[in-house]
Amino acid sequence: MSLLKKKDEKKTEQERVEERREEVLAKGRKFKYPLQWTKHRIVINTILISIIILAIIVVGGWLALYRLGMTDELLYRITKIVPASVATVDNEAVRFSDYLMLYRSSMTSIERQSGSQFDQSSVESLRAEYKRIALTEAEKYTFAASLAKQLDIEVTKEEVAAEFDRHLKIGGIDRSEEGFLKIISDNFGMDKSEYERMLYLSLLKSKVSIAIDENANKIAGQVEKLLSENNNNYGAVAEQLGDAVSYEETGGLVDSKNIDGGRASEAMKLEPGASSGKFVSMNGDGYYFVKLIKKTDSEANFVSIKVPFSEFDKRFNELVESQKINESIKIVDPNNQ
């Protein structure tokens, strides 16, 4: 009897321990679950706040770019990261960053001089004018890129590097890269990657223009043939071809650094009376032929014939007329409202 009583007492003691354990665990759960709920709520609130901030940034950026037409440095940097489009050309997106790059490079020197040379009204008109020019140019580059895909045309990194090196030596001056980058930064507000981007776009458009302009290639062939038959008489050849070409004489010595599409620097390579073969103008708008009349160490007197490219602009204008170019911004000159 006493043995059964001890077993009962022992069992009762174990039960008391279990009960105590459950009480402790139950009290712990009261603290555990509210803490988990609080952490969960903090995570949700953080996500919601992040979404709200992101939405404010997106809406603010959209208003700044598409409604207010802002072009400041921060927005430009954002468009280089975020693939925003400023227009479409035959359903191909025009990069906002390209438009801003072209516009900002054109306006940099003017805005730096505006305090002394231009009144505010003139500056605003210039901004509207250069925005229009930059947007049209960006649209043309996009159209060129679209045609390049169709024609399997590309511009390699090596070609861009070679063109960059050529620009270092424009005018016969062997500039250092550091010095040249300072020049483009001071005058255009561009760094090397931006300048290389501009060179890439220009080279691509030039290659496409050459590939599609059968008429210009045909006329250039006629110029070569006629020059050979007429002892390099540029005036006579230009007269025969009429409006298909343009003829120009310097009328005297001009600086070899003259900004003329590369004609002066090309003439400096020749001997008097010699004629160059055809070469593409530095801005890619046509072929040039040059004949040297006279030169010194730093100047040249020459005549030239230009065969302009026209097919690219013709096709682009057809897109404009058929309303296949849709712009996401409105460019308005405040002085003409």
Predicted stretch roles:
Residues 80, 92-96, 123-132, 136-141, ...:
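Solvent-exposed, acidic/flexible segments
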Residues 1-125, 262, 266, 284, ...:
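Short, low-structural-confidence N-terminal segments
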Residues 298-299, 305-337:
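Extracellularly exposed regions in secreted/surface proteins, prominently low-complexity, repeat-rich
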Residues 181-210, 262-306:
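Proteostasis/folding factors centered on peptidyl-prolyl cis-trans isomerases
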Residues 73-190, 194:
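N-terminal targeting/tethering segments
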Residues 225-266, 294-301:
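Peptidyl-prolyl cis-trans isomerase
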